[in-house]
Amino acid sequence: MFGMGFFEILVVLVVAIIFLGPEKFPQAVVDVVKFFRAVKKTLNDAKDTLDKEINIEEIKKETLEYQKLFEDKIEGLKGVRIEELEDAKIVAEKEIKSVQDLMQDYKQSLENNAPPKHLNKEVSNREVFHNEPPKEIELIANNNTTKHDKEKEHV
């Protein structure tokens, strides 16, 4: 204890008995033991508080890590949505170009009094077997209906 050997502790006890006397010595020992217990309790409380603070810091670090992970996932989802919109835009542009080509073909056929080129294409077996109209004809039919509706609005 405190770097003292058994002989040194014995010398301190003998000096304490001589200095304090046999009546005060037991009370002094009790007071010293209470003091060391209080110091030990205070140190343990400080240690527990420090452990709790360290635990709180670890929880804060974990929370920040989860928050960063969550934000990264949100950014990833935003990127997916933008990519999906760009893909949809490309598909829509292709469809618009296809419709414009069909309209151009239709206009040329009206000018030349010939059937449109897209009507000369063969219809697939699937469309005939399932009684489905060809897809390109559906687009023209929908387009004509839209034009007819627009003409009604102007009248």
From Swiss-Prot:
Region (Disordered): 109-155
Keyword Transmembrane applies: yes
Chain ranges passing through the membrane: 1-21
GO molecular function, a single term: protein transmembrane transporter activity
Biased composition (Basic and acidic residues): 119-138, 146-155
InterPro entries linked to this entry: TatB (IPR018448)
Domain of life assignment: Bacteria
Known role: Part of the twin-arginine translocation (Tat) system that transports large folded proteins containing a characteristic twin-arginine motif in their signal peptide across membranes. Together with TatC, TatB is part of a receptor directly interacting with Tat signal peptides. TatB may form an oligomeric binding site that transiently accommodates folded Tat precursor proteins before their translocation.
The protein's name in its UniProt record: Sec-independent protein translocase protein TatB
Organism: Helicobacter acinonychis (strain Sheeba)
